């Protein structure tokens, strides 16, 4: 099982939210592997968390049921977690993107004219 498919991002968290509170809020949807709460020191309104489930289906159910729900007087956002891709998963860039001066680019213009 891929970790990324079983992990949700929880955003717009209130400053009073704890990992324990998140665990208890999300445990009805399935076995939780981990809860990681992240706080920005200078911006408490930017707190977010990652909740990793054992099964991707549980993460999907949590997103469907918890997105836009109220937690500690805040409307939270629950979405799939977006992790940085590993080197093996990253596509090899086109040489033209790395060295545009060496590529033979063509500019395409629309040849259609407005109809009346």
UniProtKB/Swiss-Prot annotation:
The keyword Cytoplasm applies. It comes from the Eukaryota. GO terms for biological process: mRNA cis splicing, via spliceosome. GO terms for cellular component: cytosol; nucleus. Keywords: Cytoplasm, Nucleus, RNA-binding. GO terms for molecular function: RNA binding. Signal peptide: none annotated. InterPro entries: Nucleotide-bd_a/b_plait_sf, PPIE_RRM, RBD_domain_sf, RRM_dom. Its main location: cytoplasm. Residues 6-83 form the RRM domain. It is found in: Cytoplasm; Nucleus. This is Uncharacterized RNA-binding protein C428.12c.
